[in-house]
């Protein structure tokens, strides 16, 4: 800030550009304890990109539309967010078909945030700036969370390592399925679906995001029938099984009641939806750790703000916040399924959830090094439009610490639900065996599956039914620094 705009002169200025108010500082060097946010800014016509960045910094920290005398009662120089870097996004602006967009780096002093509160963090970072007139569009692309701030959060209630130990499942991916149809079944028929899937070889069955307590099936009935199915399948197979009982409800009191009932029935896992809100998610995470329960999060609603490339919020930020909040599972994309998912972007999401230290990688959309300060890892969930014929691709893209959920790919099997589960389990174990033998399971994948199908009729039926079905639409959210490979998956 120039000297002439400090002191009394500053407060006679009325309305000043945000840059001159101190929210732009190209010489600023972020501290290790700063929270850093990276925004994609599309300025309004005639607005300088540095001024737009300064406006976002100001309105997400201490500024209002005019200078105020009460600044002088605070450590205002410290508490102002500093936009310190703004650069043109590749393939935008002059000479391209896209209007100019800019990556703006903004640093926030740690004292601006309440410890252990996602709600407070988000109230500043995304609370007011997205409707600001100086920007035509705004997207939060990434954040660097300092270790000092991470240490104020619980992190995942259970974590991948303890979950595998608790469930006694090692050396392979976990398998699951969402009960279908997700609405309309009676409690008893719902339980029958759960039993058939688990008996056939799945590790988990799951409620879908919008099954709560409706006239056709009260939540208590669903819990009772599902846990009866879990116990019978566990006894029949000798394996630990589970069902994600969705405890999402209209109030925290109701959610706690449902979670306590799930625990009393012997469930190892409960489920919530992203739409319940950040504070409710953190509250359920604390309950889950206290009660030794795995917490599964369905990302219901995320695409309303994460899918568009120029406005909203990248899903990698949600991954970071949810790891801090304390969930154990989160749906994070499949690459080959029916939902949005560029391969490089999905890799960035999975790395964010599973790394102890995430290295900066612009190709996968990770703009910062991130030390996770010993917070537990989150198990990603791949769900939506996947089937046994894609098993080699899923293993290649997603790694081993992931739950592969085949809903329609289990329950839509022509020989029935249990056969669908058998097909998925055999396909997975055939691929794991090939991997362990050192074979190129990606290149040989189709042949490995065909060989296994010679002695497994359910797998043969699955391969014949779904063949090479994929959903190869180009993603809307793609990497900025390398070409998208979505269409060639």
Curated annotation (Swiss-Prot):
It is an enzyme of class 4 (lyase). It comes from the Bacteria. The modification N6-carboxylysine is found at residue 206. The active site is at 180 (proton acceptor), 298 (proton acceptor). Keywords: Calvin cycle, Carbon dioxide fixation, Lyase, Magnesium, Metal-binding, Monooxygenase, Oxidoreductase. GO terms for biological process: reductive pentose-phosphate cycle. Substrate binds at residues 128, 178, 182, 299, 331, 383. Binds 1 Mg(2+) ion per subunit. PROSITE patterns: RUBISCO_LARGE (PS00157). GO terms for molecular function: magnesium ion binding; monooxygenase activity; ribulose-bisphosphate carboxylase activity. Its cofactor is Mg(2+). Mg(2+) binds at residues 206, 208-209. The record marks 338 as: Transition state stabilizer. It catalyses: 2 (2R)-3-phosphoglycerate + 2 H(+) = D-ribulose 1,5-bisphosphate + CO2 + H2O; D-ribulose 1,5-bisphosphate + O2 = 2-phosphoglycolate + (2R)-3-phosphoglycerate + 2 H(+). Its EC number is 4.1.1.39. Belongs to the RuBisCO large chain family. Type I subfamily. The basic functional RuBisCO is composed of a large chain homodimer in a 'head-to-tail' conformation. In form I RuBisCO this homodimer is arranged in a barrel-like tetramer with the small subunits forming a tetrameric 'cap' on each end of the 'barrel'. RuBisCO catalyzes two reactions: the carboxylation of D-ribulose 1,5-bisphosphate, the primary event in carbon dioxide fixation, as well as the oxidative fragmentation of the pentose substrate. Both reactions occur simultaneously and in competition at the same active site. Heterohexadecamer of 8 large chains and 8 small chains. NCBIfam families: PRK04208.1. This is Ribulose bisphosphate carboxylase large chain. It comes from Nitrosospira sp. (strain 40KI). The gene is cbbL.
């Amino acid at each position: 800030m120039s000297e002439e705009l400090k002191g009394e002169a500053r407060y006679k200025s009325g309305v000043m550009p945000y840059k001159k108010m101190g929210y732009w500082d190209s010489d600023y060097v972020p501290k290790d304890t700063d929270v850093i946010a990276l925004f994609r800014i599309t300025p309004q016509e005639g607005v300088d990109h540095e001024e737009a960045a300064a406006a976002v910094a100001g309105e997400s920290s201490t500024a209002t539309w005019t200078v105020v005398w009460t600044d002088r009662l605070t450590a205002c120089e410290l508490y102002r967010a500093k936009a310190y870097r703004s650069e043109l996004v590749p393939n935008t602006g002059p000479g391209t078909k896209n209007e100019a967009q800019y990556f703006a780096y903004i640093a926030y002093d740690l004292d601006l945030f309440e410890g252990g509160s996602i709600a407070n963090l988000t109230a500043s970072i995304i609370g007011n700036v997205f409707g600001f007139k100086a920007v035509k569009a705004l997207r939060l692309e990434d954040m660097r969370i300092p270790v000092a701030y991470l240490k104020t959060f619980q992190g995942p209630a259970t974590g991948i390592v303890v979950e595998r130990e608790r469930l006694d499942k090692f050396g392979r991916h976990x398998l699951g399925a969402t009960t279908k149809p997700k609405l309309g079944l009676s409690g008893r028929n719902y339980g029958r679906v759960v039993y058939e899937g688990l008996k056939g070889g799945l590790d988990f069955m799951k409620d879908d995001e919008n099954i709560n307590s409706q006239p056709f099936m009260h939540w208590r009935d669903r819990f009772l029938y599902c846990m009866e199915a879990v116990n019978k399948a566990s006894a029949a197979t000798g394996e630990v099984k589970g069902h994600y009982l969705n405890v999402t409800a209209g109030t925290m009191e109701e959610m706690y009641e449902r979670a306590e009932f799930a625990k009393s029935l012997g469930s190892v896992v409960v489920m919530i939806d992203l739409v319940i809100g950040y504070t409710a998610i953190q509250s359920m995470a604390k309950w889950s750790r206290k009660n030794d329960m795995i917490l599964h999060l369905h990302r219901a609603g995320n695409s309303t703000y994460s899918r568009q490339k120029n406005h909203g919020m990248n899903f990698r930020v949600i991954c970071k916040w949810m790891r801090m909040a304390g969930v154990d599972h989160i749906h994070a994309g499949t690459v080959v399924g029916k939902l949005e998912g560029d391969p490089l972007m999905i890799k960035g999401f999975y790395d964010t959830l599973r790394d102890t230290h995430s290295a900066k990688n612009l190709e996968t959309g990770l703009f910062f090094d991130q030390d996770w300060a010993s917070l537990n890892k989150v198990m990603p969930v791949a769900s939506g439009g996947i089937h046994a014929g894609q098993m080699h691709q899923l293993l290649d893209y997603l790694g081993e610490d992931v739950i592969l959920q085949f809903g329609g790919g289990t329950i839509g099997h022509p020989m029935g639900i249990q056969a669908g589960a058998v097909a998925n389990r055999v396909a997975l174990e055939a691929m794991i065996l090939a991997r362990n033998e050192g074979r190129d399971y990606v290149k040989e994948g189709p042949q490995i599956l065909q060989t296994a199908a010679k002695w497994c009729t359910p797998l043969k039926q699955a391969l014949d039914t779904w063949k090479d079905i994929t959903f190869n639409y180009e993603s809307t959210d793609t990497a900025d620094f390398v070409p998208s490979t979505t269409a060639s998956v």
